[in-house]
Amino acid sequence: MMFQITKSKLRFPLSTFTKRYSSFQAAKSVIDKAAIDGELRVFIVSGEVSGDNIGSRLMSSLKKLSPLPIRFNGVGGSLMCKKGLNSLFPMEDLAVMGVWELLPHLYKFRVKLKETIDAAVKFKPHVVVTVDSKGFSFRLLKELRARYKQQRLENCSVHFHYVAPSFWAWKGGESRLGGLSEFVDHLFCILPNEERVCREHGVEATFVGHPVLEDASEFDLVRRCKPQELKLEGLSFSEHSIPSDSTVISVLPGSRLQEVERMLPIFSKAMKLLKDPFPKLVTLIHVASNNQVDHYIGESFSEWPVPAILVPSGSTQLKYDAFGASQAALCTSGTVAVELQLAHLPSLVAYRAHFLTELLIRYKAKIPYISLPNILLDSPIIPEALFQACNPSNLASILERLLLDEKMRERQVVGAEKLIQLLHPSESRMGNSIHCTGLESHRYTPSILAASTILSYARR
């Protein structure tokens, strides 16, 4: 699908583009090479829900900044498809996490990898962008680069990877960074200090800020929504026959089918234990944008032990409104832990995996926490229930304290303010990028910074 950027759609003067384009020609940038073909071709791949969100926003920002029409191809979810991507296959086919959990899916994984490589070569992209999902992404980029050399293709596409691997979390992680430069031209880092470490190991990188910061710029995150004001499935709480003085907990079991299958039964048993201390307990079960997850939760819904309402995917504001109507949250470890902090909603992070994967994590991990807020603040601001500690009795006990202990709740709110500052790149770190785009600094989101870097990139 072709996207034409006209003068009327530009958020800043066309003269800005003319000036930028002249400098790009001299530097033989991505946009200069694309100009020869009269369009910018971007092959973009995401393998999970959080990556679909990042990818869709990057696509929007590229269309906003590019002086050329853009054509997209690759793999993504519903959000990326809404921006014009015709996904090669369902993104859920790649949503597998863990070493041992991957084994049953290896054949399908290899088939999808070959299909993606063949499609990328046929598409002849100027830019390849992979988003997170490093297992699939790095194999794709590595084999693509090998294919270029094998076919002696000149002026091959530039490779970007969005979300640097968590090298800081694993023993020996930094030592493996150097090898990335063989198939990744530029990394987009979402955490402070990652850019510096990547560059020290020979990998070009830019700290663009954490993707959830875009939620803060677009939505009202900390609005305290009274339960009776919240509309879910088209109905208010009262229309769902739920009292306005209910104790409301948001439950977020994950975005991948394998983790939801593992976590939801544990969460269900924990809610059953909370029925006695909180007789008016109600849960808001957040459903990820994943058809397999949607189906599984739908089938499990009838066995849920307390009154519950499903919060569908597709509306970020609805998600944050549901957070605002809740007194606490129980979530599987992931990006959502940061989203809950932005919403100032006290939460408990839980995680279980295959026992062999858990053993590997214990052996290889060099940090004591699993949730990003705790890692960045180097403090257990958010309680974590991991591995064997992730059992119904312990989850119920921690949630009860979280609902009743004001000091425990306040600690998370204070920590959230510190976290937001850490996740945002300072104006000085952005260098001249703000001036290159013509955007005011307060509108310089992570995806805009990434898009600007892609368009102005010139391989050394």
Curated annotation (Swiss-Prot):
Disruption phenotype: No visible phenotype under normal growth conditions, but plants lacking LPXB accumulate high levels of 2,3-diacylglucosamine-1-phosphate and UDP-2,3-diacylglucosamine. It comes from the Eukaryota. GO terms for cellular component: membrane; mitochondrion. Keywords: Glycosyltransferase, Lipid A biosynthesis, Lipid biosynthesis, Lipid metabolism, Mitochondrion, Transferase, Transit peptide. Its EC number is 2.4.1.182. GO terms for molecular function: lipid-A-disaccharide synthase activity. PANTHER family: LIPID-A-DISACCHARIDE SYNTHASE, LIPID-A-DISACCHARIDE SYNTHASE, MITOCHONDRIAL-RELATED. This is Probable lipid-A-disaccharide synthase, mitochondrial. It comes from Arabidopsis thaliana (Mouse-ear cress). The lineage of its organism: Eukaryota, Viridiplantae, Streptophyta, Embryophyta, Tracheophyta.
